[in-house]
Amino acid sequence: MVIVVFQFSTNPKMSDEYFKEVELLKKEIKNEKGFISAERYASKAVKDSYVSISTWKDKKSVENWHKNKRHQLSQNKGKEKIFKSFRIRVAEVFKDYGSD
């Protein structure tokens, strides 16, 4: 299992534009082979700052999503005008357990 942590801040008044892109990608990502889940959190301390955590079956699944044409269009739009800053971390899960 692989986790992708995407931390980002949007430029002023660009959060709505980001969430429009998210809506365009929702159906696409759900049909992506190896996709497990995605969650997004807004910072209470820093305005227009978010963290998105997606879970994938394996590294190949993440690589395929990165190459997805619609995703690439959204990435480029984000880099050009939506994001003030961003950081992406990709990590392999070596342990996963819980009470459920």
Predicted segments with their positions:
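Short S/T/G/P-rich N-terminal loop/turn motif that feeds into the first structured element of a domain
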Residues: M1-S49, K57-K67, F83-D100
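Conserved short loop/helix modules at catalytic or binding sites
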Residues: S74
